[in-house]
């Protein structure tokens, strides 16, 4: 998508755009994506509603809200702004408390390489995790 609704090099613009997700469900994101047909939307509801699928909610937000192609690059999702996107579901317990539905993986750590890096502030872990946008 050429005309993004946010400036991909601006962390403030990304955050401000993400605020549009407040009080929205993942289903709402699909319903409001102007780039998919009703037929495709039905298939996507089924695909993203698979309880065995890990990471699919993050992919839904990446593709249908932020409109960028899903990738497995080790750099931050919004690399130009230095912002990493993390999406995680939660459940509401009987007493009303929130509980993480699954563990949240921040990044894959190469223990040998990151251990050898003497300056933590220059490590892959720090570069990837320094600024995160957490959506739940």
Language model region names:
Residues 1-79, 84-136:
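Nucleic-acid endonuclease domains
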